[in-house]
């Protein structure tokens, strides 16, 4: 990854970013199914070349108004391949082998402004126009964003936000290839997979920054996720990323902060979530499903001692039954804790952490839709305990680093 940036004294920033990604792998598989044995091996490599160019101009005007506008252009060449060979003869299996060059271009132009109207009201607005072109698919989309904050009186805050954006599939998910997970399960690529758009509206009321109640509506046309399908012509299950017609989410959320003396403080969050998933073209088992779920989350900090400085934390998470397309998801919960000692000069820290200490975050998925039946239980031991010793030398401060965008990389 190579990055070059320019920052001017008059608000102009410009730059470029080049990324080369290569992930070769070799897999051997022996399939024993219905008295038939087949040995396969395949070589694959995900090779990505991505260029990003951008320019942005920011104007700070009198009265606290800021205006910005800019352009961002991304081009990607995907030179990935996968070659299957018979494990005994070494002969190439052309039906399952692919070597493709896939090109993708994205142009994003945007403008935005922010202003504070006195001490009670502030607003931010922006509009992005995005062009996406890949493999014969060509589309323009507009994505507006509005954020407002109103404080009618001390301790009372009203927030409204409308956001919109686009999400792209991982590059490997777009390859027209098949990977064998085991003798029964297969992972199929989907070259027809489309990006999804997301539109979200939030309304929140905060009281003294300690209590909050809010509502959210989230609409995602062309939402994509991996779903299973049991093939009718042979004993196998294919797992493939597919586009829904849409996914909708209505959420009611509350938050409360609490404090017990000077040694315990925490927050608790409660969510009521109504889900609506629809896919009218999912093989021969189209679905239009609804589900109400409850999510609870809490974080707590305990000052166990001031001299010596010892702090403990306890966090908990719970989610009731939920759905994901044709899947039914079991309830899950997670309890994690930590203990931290800090030296009087603040240079030394000793931290002991325990994650999912009751091993209750394993999810069971159940498929019972149409003629499809499947139940998968996760029996992994997710418990982990870590010990950390940290020492800060002199006045060292960690430098800020820009993370490489890897969301679409990997398999």
Task: Show where each model-derived region lies.
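Outer-membrane beta-barrel signature, preferentially recognizing the C-terminal barrel domain
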Residues: 166-215, 219-220, 237-251, 259, ...
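Outer-membrane beta-barrel translocator domains and adjoining extracellular loop/strand segments
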Residues: 1, 15-17, 23-34, 80-90, ...
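Residues that define the transmembrane beta-barrel architecture of outer-membrane proteins
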Residues: 47-51, 101-107, 138-142, 195-201, ...
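C-terminal beta-signal and adjacent terminal beta-strands/loops
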Residues: 343-411
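Transmembrane beta-strands of outer-membrane beta-barrel pores
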Residues: 6, 16-22, 73-79, 127-135, ...
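Face-selective signature of the C-terminal outer-membrane beta-barrel domain
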Residues: 1-144, 151-155, 211-214, 248-272, ...
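C-terminal beta-barrel architecture of Gram-negative outer-membrane proteins
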Residues: 297-342, 355-358, 366-370
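Gram-negative outer-membrane beta-barrel transporters
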Residues: 245-319
